[in-house]
């Protein structure tokens, strides 16, 4: 795992899961995509900060759980520089906490799901169309199952047989 790195940027010390838990998610995604070296910035921000970012980059004036920015290597940058850098992920822990409560999910499970979701965006996956969404969701379900986490797209009542 020495070749996989998450740069945690959490200036306000928002509560987050263990770094090992999130590194395990990166390892799963990297293994699935035959990536041996990867680096990601994980920015932990407040609801206000993510709302500003969401408004600026997505024209949506509301907080969201995650925003991913895939790295695009500038022209002229030598191939051996920044090859491993996938991009930046911005997460608002308070949004994740509220979603986990509303959806009756374990908070760490939800964190892992959303972080994997963001990593897949950095690798070019999207969910704009139904077909793209199905591919991305199926991959998320498969990766989460390897972590022992239930399908996040099934209502909690359905998972409990109610």
Swiss-Prot record:
GO terms for biological process: rRNA processing. Belongs to the endoribonuclease YbeY family. This is Endoribonuclease YbeY. InterPro entries: MetalPrtase_cat_dom_sf_prd (IPR023091), YbeY (IPR002036), YbeY_CS (IPR020549). Pfam families: YbeY. Its EC number is 3.1.-.-. Single strand-specific metallo-endoribonuclease involved in late-stage 70S ribosome quality control and in maturation of the 3' terminus of the 16S rRNA. Binds 1 zinc ion. GO terms for molecular function: metalloendopeptidase activity; RNA endonuclease activity; zinc ion binding.
